[in-house]
């Protein structure tokens, strides 16, 4: 059953697409819209956020919401899987060998990297980071050069707690554990909360790195369908209740690869379902800081009242991919597992922790994010516009993220993304074929591209090569 804000968004979308509300027209303010429709302010906000995520409207600072020009939201929607026989049942990840092959190709520095989701070095505040590390070392104490607390240095835990509090998200430093990046964190929690052969509930399509990690840990998956508006909440509840899986691995804010951001109502619902069915949610919130708006969205953990949500994150997507520093927040309910988890969580380099703590406390991180967010938004829009131009005449769909910098392209069913991947590799181009993001070759007509680098002439030429291949493939099949 749809939420009220989804029904309101559908009605507004129909009016925009029918021309009843024209491009450039200003919409009622959130308060006015709530009063007109006799709905709560939160429902109105969720409605506008959904339309913004779909590229139908945009917000101007201190001016309000406006209808986007049509060219900006054409080809923006990705359908949910069109498989009537698609069942959310426990199964093994079948693409492990291919996952490993493509992962190794992604670190080849000689390739044009359109695949791996990472920031350009031009967006990394290298000088400011160096200053923070130098300050941290200058004012460090003798004990900072000994083995550190396995939970992580208290200075960094306090810095993260204070940083999140500014965004209305409060977690005690005592509940924060520092790790060597987000993926090791997820692996630690999967190993701690499940056993080999157990199932883990994941949306589909889902980040291929997570699927690879689950396969290597000999965990099965229970897939629930997702699209650019989020995932099927009814199927999620059914999976929690019936599948036998007692852990979900979810990203609520700017999911990779689709880029959706769940509404606050949906996040609260997930926290409630987790408690109702005693199904732990491991929340990967690695992209929250990459929001295109000034305010980062709240995580599912914000609504967790019973201790069934484990909050995880890292700075690798918002600061630097080389800073392999992550964290997880252990709810009080799981404190008895402290020793078991600490044993699996390898200690993190102490000077690096102190440097990052200085970077946060000095507000350099906040300033970096303030500059980064509009830059990412601009880059993503430039990529979308160039892709629309390059693939002109091709029946394709393209997501419209409001955070994150992953672009998900869906082509006609005749396109084999694995064949496109091998063609691109021969041309010195790296991309990620959609087949890696789910089972049953469900996304073999999709690819994921990275918009974290400036749209250079070299990248434009690479995208044009991909478009030419797709167009030629469709023409050849049409003739045949």
What residues fall within each predicted segment?
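Short Gly/Ser/Thr- and Asp/Glu-enriched loop/turn motifs at secondary-structure junctions
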Residues: 60-62, 173, 400-404
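Conserved core segment of the aminotransferase class I/II
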Residues: 129, 305-374
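Conserved glycine-rich beta-strand-loop-beta hairpin in the small C-terminal domain of fold type I
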Residues: 374-384, 396-410
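N-terminal small-domain helix-loop-helix segment of the aminotransferase-like
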Residues: 88-180, 188, 361, 430, ...
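N-terminal basic, amphipathic alpha-helical segments
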Residues: 1-134, 314, 342-348, 382, ...
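Conserved core of the PLP fold type I
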Residues: 140-277, 282, 288-290, 295-303, ...
């Amino acid at each position: 059953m749809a939420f009220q804000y989804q029904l309101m968004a559908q009605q507004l979308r129909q009016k925009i697409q029918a021309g009843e509300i024209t491009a450039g027209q200003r919409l009622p303010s959130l308060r006015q819209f709530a009063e007109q429709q006799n709905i709560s302010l939160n429902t109105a906000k969720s409605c506008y956020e959904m339309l913004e995520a779909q590229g139908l409207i945009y917000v101007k600072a201190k001016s309000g919401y406006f209808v986007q020009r049509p060219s900006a939201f054409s080809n923006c929607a990705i359908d949910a899987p069109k498989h009537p026989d698609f069942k959310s049942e426990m199964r093994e990840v079948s693409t492990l060998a291919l996952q490993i092959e493509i992962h190794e190709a992604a670190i080849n520095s000689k390739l044009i990297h359109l695949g791996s989701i990472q920031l350009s070095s031009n967006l990394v505040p290298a000088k400011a980071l160096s200053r923070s590390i130098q300050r941290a070392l200058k004012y460090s104490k003798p004990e900072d050069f000994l083995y550190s607390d396995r939970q992580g240095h208290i200075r960094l835990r306090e810095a993260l707690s204070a940083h999140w509090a500014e965004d209305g998200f409060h977690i005690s430093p005592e509940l924060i554990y520092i790790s060597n990046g987000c993926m090791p964190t997820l692996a630690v929690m999967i190993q701690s909360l499940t056993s080999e052969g157990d199932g883990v509930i994941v949306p589909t399509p889902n980040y291929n790195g997570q699927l690879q990690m689950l396969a290597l840990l000999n965990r099965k998956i229970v897939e629930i369908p997702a699209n650019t508006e989020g995932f099927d909440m009814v199927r999620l509840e059914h999976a929690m209740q019936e599948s036998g899986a007692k852990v979900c691995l979810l990203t609520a804010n700017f999911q990779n690869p689709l880029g959706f951001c769940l509404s606050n109502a949906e996040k609260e619902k997930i926290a409630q379902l987790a408690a109702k069915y005693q199904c732990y949610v491991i929340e990967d919130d690695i992209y929250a800081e990459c929001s295109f708006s000034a305010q980062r969205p709240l995580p599912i953990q914000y609504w967790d009242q019973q201790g069934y949500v484990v909050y995880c994150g890292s700075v690798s997507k918002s600061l630097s991919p080389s800073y392999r520093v992550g964290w997880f927040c252990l709810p009080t309910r799981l404190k008895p597992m402290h020793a078991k988890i600490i044993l699996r969580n390898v200690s993190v380099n102490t000077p690096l922790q102190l440097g990052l703590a200085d970077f946060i406390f000095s507000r350099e991180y906040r300033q970096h994010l303030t500059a980064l967010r509009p830059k990412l938004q601009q880059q993503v829009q430039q990529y979308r516009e160039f892709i629309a131009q390059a693939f002109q005449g091709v029946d394709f769909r393209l997501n419209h993220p409001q955070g994150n910098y992953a672009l998900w392209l869906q082509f006609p069913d005749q396109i084999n993304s694995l064949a496109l991947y091998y063609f691109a590799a021969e041309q010195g181009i790296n991309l990620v074929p959609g087949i890696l993001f789910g089972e049953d070759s469900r996304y073999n007509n999709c690819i994921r591209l990275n918009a974290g680098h400036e749209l250079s002439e070299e990248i434009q030429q690479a995208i044009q090569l991909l478009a030419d291949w797709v167009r030629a493939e469709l023409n050849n099949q049409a003739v045949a």
